[in-house]
Amino acid sequence: MELDLICRDLGVVDYAETWERMKQFTQIRSKDDADEIWLLEHPSLFTQGQAGKEEHLLAPGDIPVIQVDRGGQVTYHGPGQLVAYVMVDLKRLGIGVRDLVSVLENSVVRALALNAIEAYPKPDAPGVYVDEQKIASLGLRVRRGCSFHGLALNVDMDLTPFNRINPCGYQGLQMVDMKRLNKGVILSNVKAQLANQLAEQLGYNYPAIQQGWK
């Protein structure tokens, strides 16, 4: 049975609720359930991954910090950052975790190229970079052979909260967003571009984007 990729546009949603829905989706899905990508933004918060160290939280202040079950260290989420949660059956796709990381990175690089931004991944530091500045962060978890969590692409956002942490555990790492590199960037366009690139890299047709959870 050939399955389509389901892609959902969820708008701005609470992190804790979305995290719980991801875990539930992954726990109960069967081998016959379609893979899904959730596109969304979160209100301001820091998330600390499984490898996270307290010393990289420099001065969180009034921004909440949530300890989560993804890989990686601390990062910031906020309005104007496009988050893509990628829930795919790795075994069914015939790929491993490292392959999925490459899919996410290559999808971001291609979406950025469509906006006249030249970017690249780094083999020793997952994510996507422009002139040594980080524009997209990755963090994944695999359970029962299926992935959840995903990537965060800085589109048009306030980057100052990143100064309160060592992003992804790297002291002095500079962050950048698309708007600073291309004034014509529109988040809704980037959303569709990223969805299409993710689908193509995963071997799917371009998806119709559904609004909301259902």
Curated annotation (Swiss-Prot):
The active site is at C168. The record marks K134 as: Lowers pKa of active site Cys. It catalyses: octanoyl-[ACP] + L-lysyl-[protein] = N(6)-octanoyl-L-lysyl-[protein] + holo-[ACP] + H(+). Substrate binds at R70, G71, G72, Q73, V74, T75, Y76, H77, S137, L138, G139, G150, L151, A152. Residues 31-206 form the BPL/LPL catalytic domain. InterPro entries: aa-tRNA-synth_II/BPL/LPL, BPL_LPL_catalytic, Octanoyltransferase, Octanoyltransferase_CS. Pathway: Protein modification; protein lipoylation via endogenous pathway; protein N(6)-(lipoyl)lysine from octanoyl-[acyl-carrier-protein]: step 1/2. It holds the Pfam family LplA-B_cat. Its EC number is 2.3.1.181. SUPFAM superfamilies: Class II aaRS and biotin synthetases (SSF55681). It is an enzyme of class 2 (transferase). One of its GO terms (molecular function) is lipoyl(octanoyl) transferase activity. One of its GO terms (biological process) is protein modification process. Keywords: Acyltransferase, Cytoplasm, Transferase. GO terms for cellular component: cytoplasm. It is found in: Cytoplasm. In the reaction, the free carboxyl group of octanoic acid is attached via an amide linkage to the epsilon-amino group of a specific lysine residue of lipoyl domains of lipoate-dependent enzymes. Belongs to the LipB family. Catalyzes the transfer of endogenously produced octanoic acid from octanoyl-acyl-carrier-protein onto the lipoyl domains of lipoate-dependent enzymes. Lipoyl-ACP can also act as a substrate although octanoyl-ACP is likely to be the physiological substrate. This is Octanoyltransferase. The lineage of its organism: Bacteria, Pseudomonadati, Pseudomonadota, Gammaproteobacteria, Oceanospirillales.
